[in-house]
Amino acid sequence: MDVVVFSLFIMILTVIAALTGEWWVHLRALKRIPIRIHINGTRGKSSVTRLICAGLREAGFSVLGKTTGSDPRILDLEGKDRKIHRLQKPSIGEQVRFLRYFGQFRPQAVVLECMAVQPQYQWITEQHMVKSTHSVITNARLDHVEEMGHRLRDIAMSLSNTIPFKGNLFTAEQDKLEIFNEVAAKRRTEVHAVTDHGVSHDDMMGFNHIEHPENVALSIAVCESLGISREQALEGMRKAQPDPGALRIWDLEMDGRHFSLVNAFAANDPQSTKTIWNMIKEHPSLDHEHTCAFLNTRSDRVNRSSQLLELILKDIKPDSLFVRGDKMERFEKPFFSKVKGRVEQFSEN
């Protein structure tokens, strides 16, 4: 046999052996984690990850979590946040590394927020990396349209890539539920459609931030499927540390005047922003005598900025509008000129 051919043959065998070994190590890590909960969806992933972890922990489960939202964190066995310091750009490959790391502790459950946006990577993450026992798709909304498609149906189909085979799917999505039902049926997965109708005002009391009822409803449903009572799950969720990007209200005093600042920057699509606006309109501690809106724009998301400005003009109707970003001249005539109060613009530079 030619030396070059023989060397190539040995190299190929070595690569195959290495890949097989890596796959075996990963499968062994998964076997050490009997309950694997994978959280996907357009909005609420980080919050639901934290709520489920807290509900399980309250019931005595040993549980680890990982969020990838505003500020990626590990949620350790005691429920404390451990900041993730990345030395390179985030990639879905880190899910494998963290699953192996988590497997060393042999927890009863791991709750992972999905990192992938592009459809093919969502498939790889679920079907080859996580292999979840419980999948959660919070909702399907018009976001990341460049990667997932410009129609809600396209986005729902993309998100459905994280529906497992022979597992459980929990979702609060209503408009595109039929898509999830169809995909789940082909994969012999049971669908648990959840609404927030059963979440009362009393249930929402005790949280140290503004939480969405549908996030709580989803998290309760997952906990109940694992034998945890609704009351016990809620008790744990109220103790959960909110995500850095969670919806919160800060009371400020400036020059003898009182202001309330609502941090809603994590909601960067029109539907989610409108939902939050409707929530805070009903909040008893907020005075709507004078409303200011602050919009942070991105030069690579012109369509998104236009949609949010349209929503601000139509629904919020602020007395003042503050906009940060570059190349904002395109918004002046169609939007800024229609604001009833003053408009302040801030450059990124």
Predicted segments with their positions:
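Short, basic phosphate-binding NTP loop
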Residues: 1-40, 47-51, 59
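A conserved, hydrophobic alpha-helical segment in the catalytic core
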Residues: 129-139, 179, 208-242
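Gly/charged, well-structured mid-domain segments that form the phosphate/adenylate-handling core
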Residues: 224-262, 267
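Hydrophobic anchor at the start of a short beta-strand
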Residues: 61-64, 109, 191, 291, ...
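ATP-dependent carboxylate-amine ligase catalytic core
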Residues: 27-33, 54-135, 139, 143-156
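Active-site beta-alpha connecting loops in nucleotide-dependent enzymes
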Residues: 175-176, 265-345
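Hydrophobic alpha-helical packing residues
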Residues: 52, 56-57, 184, 335
